[in-house]
Amino acid sequence: MIRGLGIDVVELDRIEAALIRFGDRFLARILTPAERAALPPIPLTRTAGLFAAKEAAAKALGTGFAQGVAFHTLEILSDAAGRPALTLHGPALARAEALGATSWHVSISHSRDTAAAVVVLEG
């Protein structure tokens, strides 16, 4: 049974502007240390995809970025096959459990100008 669904689309220009203006401070605000360590040398599309995925996850949880759900409570790393895998921490995990979710799935896609992500919570 679906317990939550979230989708987000972000323009690459918006993320590029934040990277130019704030650089590592922006990355540290939205990404966990493990996510930052996994970034490629030119991080624009990957960062935009992760941003969209975290926004989608916050929507799927039904809280947005409130009630303790924050960028660092949502972590997306690639599995051995290169697929994005969402890990929930702290308040994000507690919220998913309160919704009856026992598993969650994330899909990230990019175009020339945008990144998009969908998160589904199942239980």
From Swiss-Prot:
Designated name of the protein: Holo-[acyl-carrier-protein] synthase
Taxonomy, superkingdom: Bacteria
Gene Ontology MF annotations: holo-[acyl-carrier-protein] synthase activity; magnesium ion binding
Keyword tags: Cytoplasm, Fatty acid biosynthesis, Fatty acid metabolism, Lipid biosynthesis, Lipid metabolism, Magnesium, Metal-binding, Transferase
Family: Belongs to the P-Pant transferase superfamily. AcpS family.
Entry-linked InterPro entries: 4-PPantetheinyl_Trfase_dom (IPR008278), 4-PPantetheinyl_Trfase_dom_sf (IPR037143), ACPS (IPR002582), Ppantetheine-prot_Trfase_dom (IPR004568)
EC assignment: 2.7.8.7
Listed GO CC annotations: cytoplasm
Cofactor(s) needed for function: Mg(2+)
HAMAP family, per database record: AcpS (MF_00101)
Binding sites annotated in the UniProt record for Mg(2+): 8, 55
One Pfam family per UniProt: ACPS
Subcellular localization: Cytoplasm
Record function comment: Transfers the 4'-phosphopantetheine moiety from coenzyme A to a Ser of acyl-carrier-protein.
Reactions performed catalytically: apo-[ACP] + CoA = holo-[ACP] + adenosine 3',5'-bisphosphate + H(+)
Gene Ontology process terms (BP): fatty acid biosynthetic process
